[in-house]
């Protein structure tokens, strides 16, 4: 097995101290006001991530929930470390490392976070009759609880109409904390939070807190090299959940490439298998793909077609765990979504020639396919992939 998929060296340093430019980018993210949009008549809350983290941490500790540290995770952490990686960032993933051993710990965390939102309501709002359930319905986009032998964590995602959600994750234990090396970074925020509370002087190059980053991949410098050079690498790809396939294709569209042909084939087979294990039902696949397109291509809608074509190619080449009917069904779903986003982009008028295919397969009606669809004979976007620029009829 190649080096990118090999086990981490026990001596490889997983931590690194951030430079001054990186600390400045981190401070800008933590101090930027992020709106939390309310449903119905509830007002929009405006809060800085730094303030929200401090309030949540204080409230949890008052309730007896020990917070070991708070971290910035995901694409925002990658952006702080290397702002020109091509990944960008949308969600703010904030991890609270906590103890969730008690029988009521999950419920205590949820109520503590929801009650914190009261602090950010505009002045003049009567808070006395607002319950945690009301706040959940008004401001929470997603609520997740996982409690297994290896994983104990919960997630509260706060609503933002532009897709820039603040996601608060409360982790007691989590077996797999990353998918690829380029999204394996976590930045420990405790020193930044302490500095903002205690220092009367602003940060400068000669006077700023020491901030530490960690790569869950295992080797910080190797992961940074992958981020700078847009390399896709991972460890133990068989552990990656079904959503890893969607993230992998997103990286491909953004110009990232596997380190080697062997890595690519190994990763793709594992990820396709896991995708169909986690999402066996065609309707669940449709829902997942639509949500992914909506959440991860804000401001990049023109990339959705290229993304779906890439996903179609990977599934077509690397799926080995399905019956032929199931495989064709999934490929037809991806093809249908690709045509749909293409029509939304109003490209058909610019296409000089197109071919019309008829799809009489009986399962097509199950996911609201149109009977006819068109696909361009010539490629509409410059793309480095070698796959066909049209999608054949799947009967």
UniProtKB/Swiss-Prot annotation:
Its primary localisation, in coarse terms, equals cytoplasm
Q: Which UniProt keywords apply?
A: Cytoplasm, Nucleus, Transferase
Provide the top EC class: transferase
Q: Which domain of life is it from?
A: Eukaryota
GO annotations under biological process? negative regulation of apoptotic process; negative regulation of cell cycle; negative regulation of cell population proliferation; positive regulation of translation
Where is the protein found, in the record's own terms? Cytoplasm; Nucleus
Reaction equations catalysed? RNA(n) + ATP = RNA(n)-3'-adenine ribonucleotide + diphosphate
Q: Which Pfam families match?
A: NTP_transf_7
- GO molecular function (one): poly(A) RNA polymerase activity
Quote the SMART domains the UniProt record gives: DUF1693 (SM01153)
| EC numbers, comma separated | 2.7.7.19
User: Could you name the Gene Ontology cellular component terms for this entry?
Assistant: cytoplasm; nucleus
Q: Which InterPro entries is this protein grouped with?
A: TET5
Return the similarity comment: Belongs to the TENT family.
Q: What does this protein do?
A: Catalyzes the transfer of one adenosine molecule from an ATP to an mRNA poly(A) tail bearing a 3'-OH terminal group in an ATP hydrolysis-dependent manner and participates in cytoplasmic polyadenylation. May be involved in maintaining the translation efficiency of at least some genes through preventing degradation of their mRNAs.
State the protein's name.
Terminal nucleotidyltransferase 5B
Source species: Xenopus tropicalis
């Amino acid at each position: 097995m190649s080096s990118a998929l090999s086990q981490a060296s026990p001596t490889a340093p997983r931590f690194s101290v951030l430079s001054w430019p990186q600390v400045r980018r981190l401070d800008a993210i933590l101090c930027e006001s992020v709106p939390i949009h309310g449903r119905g008549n509830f007002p929009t809350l405006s809060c800085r991530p730094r303030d929200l983290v401090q309030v949540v941490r204080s409230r949890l500790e008052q309730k007896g929930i020990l917070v070991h540290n708070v971290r910035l995770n995901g694409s925002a952490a990658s952006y702080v470390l290397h702002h020109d990686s091509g990944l960008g960032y949308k969600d703010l993933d904030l991890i609270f490392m906590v103890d969730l051993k008690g029988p009521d710990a999950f419920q205590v965390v949820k109520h503590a976070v929801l009650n914190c939102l009261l602090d950010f309501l505009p002045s003049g709002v009567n808070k006395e009759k607002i319950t945690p359930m009301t706040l959940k319905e008004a401001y929470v986009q997603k609520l997740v609880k996982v409690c297994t032998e290896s994983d104990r964590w919960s997630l509260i995602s706060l609503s933002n109409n532009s897709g820039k959600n603040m996601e608060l994750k409360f982790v007691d234990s989590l077996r797999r904390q990353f998918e690829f090396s380029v999204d394996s970074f976590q930045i420990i925020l405790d020193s930044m939070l302490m500095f903002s509370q205690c220092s009367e002087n602003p940060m400068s190059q000669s006077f700023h807190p020491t901030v530490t980053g960690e790569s869950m991949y295992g080797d910080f410098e190797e992961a940074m090299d992958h981020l700078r050079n847009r390399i896709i690498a991972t460890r133990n790809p068989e552990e990656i959940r079904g959503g890893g396939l969607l993230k992998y294709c997103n990286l491909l569209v953004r110009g990232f490439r596997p380190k080697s042909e062997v890595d690519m084939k190994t990763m793709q087979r594992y990820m396709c298998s896991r995708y169909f294990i986690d999402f066996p039902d065609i309707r669940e696949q449709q829902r997942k793909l639509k949500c992914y397109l909506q959440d991860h291509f804000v401001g990049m809608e023109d990339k959705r077609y290229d993304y779906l074509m890439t996903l179609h190619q990977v599934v077509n080449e690397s799926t080995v765990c399905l019956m032929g009917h199931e495989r064709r069904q999934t490929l037809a779903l991806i093809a249908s979504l690709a045509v749909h986003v293409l029509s939304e982009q109003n490209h058909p008028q610019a296409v000089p020639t197109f071919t019309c295919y008829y799809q009489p397969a009986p399962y097509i009606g199950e996911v609201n396919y149109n009977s006819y669809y068109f696909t361009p004979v010539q490629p509409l976007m410059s793309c480095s992939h070698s796959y066909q620029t049209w999608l054949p009829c799947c009967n």
